[in-house]
From Swiss-Prot:
E.C. no: 6.1.1.23
Entry function: Aspartyl-tRNA synthetase with relaxed tRNA specificity since it is able to aspartylate not only its cognate tRNA(Asp) but also tRNA(Asn). Reaction proceeds in two steps: L-aspartate is first activated by ATP to form Asp-AMP and then transferred to the acceptor end of tRNA(Asp/Asn).
Name of encoding gene: aspS
Binding residues for L-aspartate: 171, 217, 446, 487
Region called Aspartate, residue ranges: 195-198
Keyword Ligase on entry: yes
Species the sequence originates in: Pseudoalteromonas atlantica (strain T6c / ATCC BAA-1087)
Protein name per its UniProtKB record: Aspartate--tRNA(Asp/Asn) ligase
Gene Ontology MF terms in the entry: aspartate-tRNA ligase activity; aspartate-tRNA(Asn) ligase activity; ATP binding; nucleic acid binding
Subunit structure: Homodimer.
Length: 592
């Protein structure tokens, strides 16, 4: 039906007759000549219809936006002064010699001249995807997956599929359950990740595995979360953490160079403890120059209890963010930041403006100066390397509150004041705690199959609170691109971890018996990592949501406006599955 794509026509085609198919992007009637902007996946080309061919001209005149058409015409150079350098095809135009309307279009429910609501865009996704910005992102995504496959297969990785219907296992989020018709009362679960299957593949001797795979999590959604998402999943045997990090860092560096012509350079490594201390986050955005600086030791003896209390508390923290040029902040801005840190449990936000660093207390402006004295103020200024024109923002509370509140404030101030430096800042975060503790119960910070760093099973059981995991996260511009770890390959160690997590031997046998069995039969050391493909493509394309780099995403309520999923199953289907529904309607609150 066609000889070329619209967007591929250029000066080398001048003098050739081409046949193109696509959609009418725009129709213009200028002085008796009709111009059609014809669009397909590869771009837009201008087609000109002359009134000399009356019947053809009338057909062209009847075209409207999004009519699907086939055209035939002669490629020619645009007249002098009409070259459009903003178009890839802007040097040429096509003189129309033929025109077939393949299908007409109703009036569009989306308006190309304004921002449409996301609900409308998702309801008519097939129209939304016709927009060049959207189709370009999907094309970019396809090239990313192709480059990933090429890189990994060139390094000896095998693309192996794992089951979509599996068993429910505790991985941190709720499972999507699928009822079994043949096993009454039993359910499959859609996989939250291929974690256990890829470990079993390593125990099978597959050595290097990868898969670009759908994963499913029934969790509360945010801008960067979807109920179904895609992972670049990787696992290896007989390689340690550093080797896995080297392979996967090489893959991402290769990808950025190939797709964006960006050299990311070698990724620095930072411990979890350093990341939290300096940036208040385990995924720090290193484009932001602001840091949290500890000053508790300087403030232990001040009369100001707001500072001295946490400074003398083993679980407290007093830290400062120095904002270059921030002395020009208004009181209103400071009050807004005070309200902001309150979201994270902070009781207030002390501040100090440095108007003149050489003028002692006279050069400082702050309601807390009277509690500090000149010597303490000098020490604080020296510690944070303050300059004239800066403002210091203080956090004083429990270490958890200060770290979280100032970490969030650092990001907000950096964005508000446009302080970000450079376009891309990757790093590895390593040495995570093995467990988190809440109310005396331990929880795996990553997942329960992560190996501890340099500990025997006995040492781990004796001191789980201080155990570090052999885990590593790749972070780019404050987003976690991927996370991985060395896995447990010893049955005794795995049993100890289950025990620490409060999983009884009976529960472990029911949920993970197959894994514990596999660990008996010469399971090799293995390690891996998984990247979020959607998030990676979002960052690389500059999209603001992963929904904008997925063909058919769900809404933030995990619904599909296009197909109206999830839907209601028929009574016959439910009966076949031995399922009875009992939906309790919430009572409306009574008016009092």
């Amino acid at each position: 039906m066609r000889t070329d794509y619209c967007g591929n026509i250029n000066a080398s085609h001048i003098g050739q007759t081409v046949t193109l198919c696509g959609w009418v992007n725009r129709r213009r009637d200028l002085g008796g000549v009709i111009f059609i902007d014809l669009r397909d996946r590869e771009g837009i080309v201008q087609v000109v219809y002359d009134p000399d061919l009356a019947e053809l001209f009338d057909t062209a005149n009847s075209l409207r936006s999004e009519f699907c058409v086939q055209i035939e015409g002669l490629v020619r150079a645009r007249p002098q002064g009409q070259v459009n350098k903003d178009m890839g095809t802007g040097e040429i135009e096509i003189l129309g010699k033929g025109l077939t309307i393949l299908n007409k279009s109703a009036v569009l429910p989306l308006d190309s001249n304004q921002e449409n609501s996301e609900e409308q865009r998702l309801k008519y996704r097939y129209l939304d995807l016709r927009r060049p910005v959207m189709s370009d992102r999907l094309k970019f995504r396809a090239k990313v997956t192709s480059a990933v496959r090429s890189y990994l297969e060139g390094d000896g990785f095998l693309d192996i599929e794992t089951p979509m219907l599996t068993k429910a296992t505790p991985e941190g989020a709720r499972d999507y359950l699928v009822p079994s018709r043949t096993h009454k009362g039993k359910f499959f679960a859609l996989p939250q990740s291929p974690q256990l299957f890829k470990q079993l593949l390593m125990m099978s001797g597959m050595d290097r595995y990868y898969q670009i795979v759908k994963c499913f999590r029934d969790e509360d959604l945010r801008a960067d979360r979807q109920p179904e998402f895609t992972q670049i999943d990787i696992e290896t045997t007989f390689l340690g953490a550093e080797q896995v990090m080297k392979i996967t860092e090489g893959m991402i560096r290769n990808l950025f160079m190939k797709m964006l012509n960006v050299d990311l350079g070698e990724f620095p490594q930072m411990t979890y403890a350093d990341a939290m201390r300096r940036f208040g986050s385990d995924k720090p955005d290193l484009r932001n120059p602001l840091e949290l600086v500890d000053v508790a030791d300087i403030l232990k003896d001040v009369e100001f209890k707001v500072f001295s209390g946490p400074a003398n508390d083993a679980k407290g923290r007093v830290a400062v963010i120095r904002v270059p040029g921030g002395a020009s902040m208004t009181r209103k801005q400071i009050d807004e930041y005070t309200k902001f840190v309150g979201i994270y449990g902070a009781k207030g936000l002390a501040w100090m403006k440095v108007n003149d660093i050489d003028a002692g207390l006279e050069g400082l402006q702050s309601p807390i100066l009277k509690f500090l004295g000149e010597d303490v103020a000098k020490q604080v200024l020296s510690r944070v390397e303050a300059q004239s024109g800066d403002i210091l923002l203080f956090g004083a509370d429990s270490a958890t509150v200060v770290t979280e509140a100032l970490g969030a404030l650092r990001l907000k101030v950096g964005e508000d004041l446009d302080l970000l430096e450079g376009e891309w800042k990757p790093l590895w975060v390593i040495d995570f705690p093995m467990f988190e503790e809440f109310d005396g119960q331990f929880y795996a910070l990553h997942h329960p199959f992560t190996a501890p760093r340099d500990m025997t099973a006995e040492q781990l059981a004796a001191d789980p609170a201080n155990a570090l995991s052999n885990a590593y996260d790749m972070v780019l511009n404050g987003c976690e691109l991927g996370g991985g770890s060395v896995r447990i390959h010893n049955q005794d160690m795995q049993a100890k971890v289950f025990n620490i997590l409060g999983i009884s031997e009976e529960e472990a046998e029911v949920k993970f018996g197959f894994l514990l069995d596999a660990l008996k039969f010469g399971a090799p050391p293995h390690a891996g990592l998984a990247f979020g493909l959607d998030r990676l493509v979002m960052l690389m394309t500059g999209a603001t949501s992963i929904r904008d780099v997925m063909a058919f995403p769900k809404t933030t309520t995990a619904a599909c406006p296009l197909t109206d999923a999830p839907g209601i199953a028929s009574d016959e289907q439910l009966k076949e599955l031995s399922i009875k529904t009992d939906i309790v309607q919430e009572k409306a609150p009574s008016a009092e």
